[in-house]
A protein has these predicted regions:
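Acidic, Ser/Thr/Pro-rich low-complexity intrinsically disordered segments
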Residues: 28-81, 90, 103, 113, ...
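N-terminal secretory signal peptides that target proteins for export/translocation
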Residues: 1-7
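Bacterial N-terminal signal peptides
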Residues: 11-23
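Extracellular and select intracellular beta-sandwich modules with Ser/Thr-enriched
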Residues: 104, 116-120, 238-240, 328-333
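Surface-exposed, short loops/turns at beta-strand junctions within beta-sandwich domains
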Residues: 99-102, 220-221, 314-319
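Predominantly extracellular/luminal regions of secreted and cell-surface proteins
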Residues: 120-149, 328-344
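Periplasmic N-terminal soluble interaction domains immediately after the signal peptide in Gram-negative
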Residues: 86-114, 122, 229
Length: 344
């Protein structure tokens, strides 16, 4: 009898523990999850109105960015017969970017009833950037949307669809075409296929910057190019968004040496395309494309600071100390912090 009583006592204790654990789990607050912002980019010195999408974003009152020069205030609904005072529209904010904010990809989080949300990327474009939204039906080469060199198109790929664009390039012009998707946390695994005016494929690319494609176009004569943008598995939807850059501006491929001692001031060789004052004298090629080079004196800071830009890469890369460097109108590259003198 004693053993039966002991067995019943143990069962009751276990049941009480399970019930108390269930009550603790149920008492946990939901996590604020910011899934999407539209639009997710703005030029320096501009103000845009954006909307936020996600879950558990009740009473969203504030947006916080990883750069102090990017600020936001909620869009207010006007007073009416029912609400005598202006009230906050939870999902819409007016975002202002200061003129001195460097171009890059930054983090944004929402402050809501359930606390600080998860982060999403927000792109700051150069002040003189020509920003274009995809418009109309452009799902075939015949209906391709016309754009100009030195433009950035923001769009999204539909499921089982292709977005087509066309642009005119001058003879000898070195045009760089880049798709930014993974780097802004898009689900798009993109590819770019280039055709000439006769419909012949010239080149294609994917997986240059992680999963994001990048390619170079150069012709001796004036040429019209057609770009076909799609997911490699033809997936699509609102979460398969992208930024398409078509540019003849400077682009840095890499810097040598790739690291320097903190606080040092040394001469580095910058390799890339369309570099100001660049030459092909070093005869360096990357995937069959000749790279220009210039010598630049760079001052590294004494103390490493966390990168201001959004980091979509592997977690271990986020702890690498370094300094973000860029030329005027170029992309940003990281120069690492060396723990010993660098010998060239």
């Amino acid at each position: 009898m004693k053993s039966i009583k002991h067995w019943k006592t143990r069962v009751c204790l276990i049941a009480l523990l399970l019930l108390s654990f269930q009550q603790l789990v149920c008492a946990q607050l939901p996590t604020a999850d910011l899934r999407q912002i539209k639009p997710f980019a703005a030029a320096a010195g501009k103000t845009v109105e954006l909307s936020i999408l996600g879950s558990n974003l009740d009473d969203a009152s504030e947006l916080r960015f990883s750069h102090p020069g990017i600020t936001a205030k909620p869009v207010m609904l006007p007073a009416d017969d029912i609400y005598p005072e202006p009230r906050r529209q939870d999902s819409r904010f007016e975002v202002s970017v200061a003129k001195d904010v460097p171009p890059g990809i930054y983090e944004v989080r929402a402050v809501s009833y359930f606390g600080l949300s998860t982060a999403r990327p927000f792109v700051v474009a150069p002040a003189d950037s020509r920003e274009i939204d995809e418009t109309g039906n452009h799902d075939s080469r015949e209906t391709a949307q016309a754009v100009e060199v030195n433009s950035t198109v923001t769009g999204s790929v539909p499921a089982r669809g292709i977005d087509w664009y066309r642009f005119q390039a001058r003879g000898g012009q070195r045009v760089l075409v880049e798709l930014i998707a993974e780097r802004v946390d898009s689900r798009l695994d993109g590819q770019i296929v280039v055709y000439d005016s006769e419909g012949r494929e010239i080149t294609r690319n994917r997986d240059w910057f992680g999963r994001d494609p990048f390619l170079e176009l150069q012709s001796e004569q004036d040429q019209e190019y057609f770009l076909a943008i799609s997911d490699i598995l033809y997936r699509g939807g609102s979460e398969h968004f992208y930024r398409l850059n078509i540019s003849d501006r400077p682009h840095i491929d890499f810097v040598f040496p790739p690291a320097g001692e903190p606080g040092s001031r040394n001469v580095y060789t910058v390799y890339g395309r369309n570099l100001p004052g660049g030459s092909l004298g070093n005869a360096v090629s990357l995937n069959g494309q000749k790279l220009e080079s210039i010598e630049v004196e760079i001052q590294l800071p004494e103390v490493a600071t966390p990168p201001a830009s959004f980091q979509p890469w592997k977690p271990r890369q986020g702890i690498l100390n370094g300094h973000e460097f860029q030329l005027e109108h170029s992309n940003t590259v990281n120069i690492g912090f060396a723990t010993a003198p660098v010998i060239r």
